[in-house]
């Protein structure tokens, strides 16, 4: 493991006042990918694509290949060619950073070491000249929060710091990772044209119900004027990781043993899975769609083929329409003297696995979990809030996280919410263009509002004077 270099702490004296550094670096520290980059120096950029060009998605993991080579962070996406039997070490578990030794190595490799940083736009040359915005999942344990504060402010010595947390001391906490989404231009997503005019100073949406379905879990966060309502936060311990593991189990029981092929099966999931809006109909199509023997029917059937990657041939995996005659074609090819390369093709035939795997997000009881699905948990979240706020939140449901990209996810969520919500409420469910980096984008807009950032962030001087316990109270809204 690479050593983390201690950062100098004597540059700024505690004896005189210190303001937040001008540069702000945001790290949305996800369990699967980190979303990181510098915020713009002045007013927020109106063009979302240009603003997101400053944000890089970096694997938050250390991997070991079957050739016993180790890759860290950004190296994974550029240097790895053989994904078979890849071993992953992730510092974030269940949404919380629990292994700071691994996390420090990934950060050092991705942001501090000039030799390994992907680009100069991600390089942090002197942390004392940078304010860092660091996100974490709601309701983290105090010990984990303290670890983050001490490592970021004492080992690296950043000049300014904001840890986006949910506070327990007040019903309106300062910030959470999900609440950063409220700082984006939400109105245009919900067709509120009167309110969607460009603003010189970034400000949060008034009412927003954030559904964050990511790698480790799904979290429902009601956000009021940029601040999360603590008692309304609900969590479903199902995320993309669980979908991948479930798909691995199903495929391993029915076809090849894919238990050790986590990365490959994650690629399969992202390529072929979808959320069914008529489960019984799709289940019937699975076994009836290709019932005419010898005649492939890709238009009616749900069944598809996924060709597994071939690292020796430098080929990536891909999905294609199911060919029920594939076996007989291969036998004929052998008789015709086809080359080994043409025949050496491993194929997964996927039918009901395509939609039964994502179905657990809506009916966790399918895998024995005694929990409600996402739509019911949204209603549970609203049930503890004033009734007068329900229409505003249901009319502004924002879905972020990688699972929202599954085809059919948005339609299914909106349909089920309409069925169980009050008839008087208008239900609008929207997803931004980039649901994975949307929280980072909100953080960058917050960073351009210098006055608001001063209220919620702390300086290095304040940390040195008051310590970690004071920092925890500050970020929890107790000060």
Curated annotation (Swiss-Prot):
Q: Name one GO biological process term.
A: chromatin remodeling
Q: Which UniProt keywords apply?
A: Activator, Chromatin regulator, Cytoplasm, Cytoskeleton, Nucleus, Transcription, Transcription regulation
Q: Which SMART domains match?
A: ACTIN
Its chief place of residence is: cytoplasm
Report the locations given in the UniProt record: Cytoplasm; Cytoplasm, Cytoskeleton; Nucleus
**Gene Ontology molecular function: any one:** nucleosome binding
Q: Which GO terms describe its cellular component?
A: cytoplasm; cytoskeleton; Swr1 complex
Its quaternary organisation is: Component of the SWR1 chromatin remodeling complex.
Q: Record's family?
A: Belongs to the actin family. ARP6 subfamily.
Give the function comment from the record: Component of the SWR1 complex which mediates the ATP-dependent exchange of histone H2A for the H2A variant HZT1 leading to transcriptional regulation of selected genes by chromatin remodeling. Involved in chromosome stability.
Kindly provide the name given to this protein in its UniProt entry: Actin-like protein arp6
């Amino acid at each position: 493991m690479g050593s983390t270099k201690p950062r100098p702490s004597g540059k700024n004296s505690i004896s005189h006042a210190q303001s937040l550094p001008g540069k702000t670096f945001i790290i949305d520290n996800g369990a699967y990918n980190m979303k990181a980059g510098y915020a713009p120096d002045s007013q927020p950029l109106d063009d979302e694509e240009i603003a997101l060009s400053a944000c890089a998605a970096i694997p938050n993991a250390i991997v070991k290949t079957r050739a016993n080579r180790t890759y860290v962070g950004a190296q994974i996406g550029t240097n790895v060619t053989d994904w078979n039997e890849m071993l992953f070490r992730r510092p974030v578990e269940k949404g919380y950073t629990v292994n700071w030794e691994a996390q420090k190595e990934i950060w050092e490799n991705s942001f501090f070491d000039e030799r390994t940083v992907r680009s100069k736009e991600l390089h942090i040359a002197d942390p004392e000249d940078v304010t860092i915005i660091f996100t974490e999942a709601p309701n983290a344990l105090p010990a984990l929060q303290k670890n983050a504060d001490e490592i970021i402010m004492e080992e690296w010595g950043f000049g300014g710091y904001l840890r986006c947390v949910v506070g327990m001391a007040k019903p309106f906490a300062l910030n959470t990772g999900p609440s950063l989404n409220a700082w984006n231009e939400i109105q245009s997503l919900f067709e509120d044209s009167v309110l969607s005019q460009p603003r010189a100073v970034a400000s949060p949406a008034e009412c927003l119900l954030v559904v964050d379905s990511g790698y480790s879990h799904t979290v429902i966060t009601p956000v009021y004027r940029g601040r999360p309502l603590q008692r309304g936060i609900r969590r479903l311990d199902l995320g993309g990781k669980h979908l991948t593991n479930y798909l691995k189990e199903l495929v391993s029981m029915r076809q090849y043993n894919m238990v050790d092929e986590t990365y490959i099966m994650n690629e399969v999931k992202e390529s072929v899975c979808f959320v069914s809006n008529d489960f019984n109909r799709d289940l019937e199509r699975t076994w009836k769609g290709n019932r005419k023997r010898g005649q492939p029917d890709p238009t009616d059937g749900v069944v598809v083929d996924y060709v597994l990657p071939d690292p020796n041939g430098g080929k990536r995996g891909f999905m294609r329409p199911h060919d029920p005659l594939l076996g007989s074609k291969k036998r004929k090819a052998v008789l015709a003297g086809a080359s080994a390369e043409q025949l050496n093709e491993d194929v997964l035939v996927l039918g009901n696995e395509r939609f039964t795997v994502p179905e657990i997000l809506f009916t966790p009881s399918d895998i024995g979990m005694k929990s409600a699905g996402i739509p019911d948990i949204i209603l549970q979240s609203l049930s503890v809030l004033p009734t007068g706020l329900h229409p505003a939140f249901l009319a502004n449901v924002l879905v972020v996280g990688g699972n929202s990209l599954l085809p059919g996810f948005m339609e299914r969520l909106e349909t089920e919410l309409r069925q169980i919500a009050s008839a008087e409420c208008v239900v609008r469910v929207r997803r931004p263009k980039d649901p994975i980096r949307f929280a980072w984008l909100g953080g960058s807009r917050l960073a351009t509002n210098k006055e608001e950032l001063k209220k919620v962030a702390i300086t290095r001087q304040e940390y040195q004077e008051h310590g970690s316990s004071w920092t925890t109270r500050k970020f929890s809204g107790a000060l």
